[in-house]
């Protein structure tokens, strides 16, 4: 598993390559499903309505899944879309995908996210959807820019899921929570990655490209004893990344983990890890646009943290899209 504990991504070149542990992907599956309940309630109805009313999908919907990993995103999304589907897993190193049985309607393409534009230029965009899960925050800003540009240029709807936001709350509270989290988030930004700002950057870029964008908060909400094994693994991975980023935190991290492990054993530890999904549509119903505008203005009003590590093109798009 990658030191940042963020399985699911396959990137195109060093130093941004992420190694994925299938065990980690399996461990997080239950947390992902629970977290996406808000997407089921808010974003999926809008997506389905758009595909039926605006795109008039009546044949096969082709779904391109970026960084597909084990195919968990397809397993989750496919039964929730009332269309005949053909899936394309676009993965630079699809070792995991090829090692697992796949539905007959699934194609695996060994290529990087930068090839999305070329892939979308082929065939009918009216019958396509781009999606990914747990990917955007481990892309470099250049790769994120390429994904958004491909979606905009080809006017394809997109559903991007489970991107980390950098937020985390742990109960009981400890004074070392924040410095350890700050170091972890800085580690997420290493080597030019978009990190915790990825989902905000993507939303801004897509709005600047004329898309209507809605979001749903999809945090992991974990507690002992039911999630103890996963929480212990998650915290250890995050601490490892924090110490790599700031070796001076080594002693603090070790003591902090021992404290949290004891609280897990006592059944008193709770943790929430921020994630967000976005649905981006090239046009849409007026009701969807109104909801999206209300959400966007609320996000702009409450956003207090600066954006880090953005590519110049995306920075310009953000400036152009703000009211």
Set out the residue ranges of the language-model regions:
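Class I SAM-dependent methyltransferase Rossmann-like catalytic core
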Residues: 2-55
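Early extracytoplasmic/lumenal segment of secretory-pathway proteins
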Residues: 290-323
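A short, conserved alpha-helix within the catalytic core of class I
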Residues: 138-151
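Conserved catalytic/acceptor-binding region of the Class I
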Residues: 156-218
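C-terminal helical/coil "lid" or tail adjacent to the Rossmann-like core of SAM-dependent
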Residues: 214-265
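Conserved class I S-adenosyl-L-methionine
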Residues: 58-69
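A conserved beta-strand element that flanks and buttresses the S-adenosyl-L-methionine
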Residues: 131
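Class I SAM-dependent methyltransferase SAM/SAH-binding core
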Residues: 71-116
């Amino acid at each position: 598993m990658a030191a940042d504990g963020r399985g699911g991504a396959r990137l195109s070149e060093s130093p941004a390559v992420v190694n994925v542990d299938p065990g980690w992907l399996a461990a997080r599956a239950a947390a992902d499903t629970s977290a996406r309940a808000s997407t089921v309630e808010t974003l999926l109805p809008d997506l389905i309505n758009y595909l039926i009313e605006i795109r008039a999908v009546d044949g096969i919907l082709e779904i391109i899944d970026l960084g597909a990993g084990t195919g968990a995103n397809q397993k989750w999304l496919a039964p929730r879309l009332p269309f005949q589907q053909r899936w394309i897993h676009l993965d630079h190193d699809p070792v995991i995908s090829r090692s697992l049985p796949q539905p007959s309607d699934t194609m695996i393409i060994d290529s990087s996210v930068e090839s999305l534009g070329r892939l979308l230029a082929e065939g009918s965009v009216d019958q396509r959807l781009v999606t990914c899960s747990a990917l955007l925050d481990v892309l470099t800003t250049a790769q994120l820019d390429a994904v958004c540009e491909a979606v905009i240029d080809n006017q394809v709807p997109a559903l991007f899921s489970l991107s980390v936001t950098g937020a985390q709350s742990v109960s009981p509270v400890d004074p070392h929570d924040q410095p350890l989290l700050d170091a972890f988030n800085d580690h997420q930004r290493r080597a030019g990655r978009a990190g915790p700002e990825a989902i905000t950057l993507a939303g801004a870029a897509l709005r600047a490209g004329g898309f209507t964008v809605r979001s749903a908060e999809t945090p992991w909400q974990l507690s002992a004893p039911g999630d103890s094994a996963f929480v212990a693994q998650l915290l250890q991975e995050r601490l490892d990344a924090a110490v790599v980023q700031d070796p001076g935190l080594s002693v603090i991290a070790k003591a902090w983990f021992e404290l949290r492990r004891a609280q897990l054993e006592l059944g008193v530890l709770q943790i929430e890890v921020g994630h967000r999904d976005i649905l981006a549509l090239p046009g849409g119903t007026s009701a969807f646009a109104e909801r999206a505008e209300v959400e966007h203005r609320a996000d702009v009003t409450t956003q207090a943290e600066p954006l880090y590590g953005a590519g110049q093109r995306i920075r310009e798009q953000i400036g152009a899209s703000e009211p």
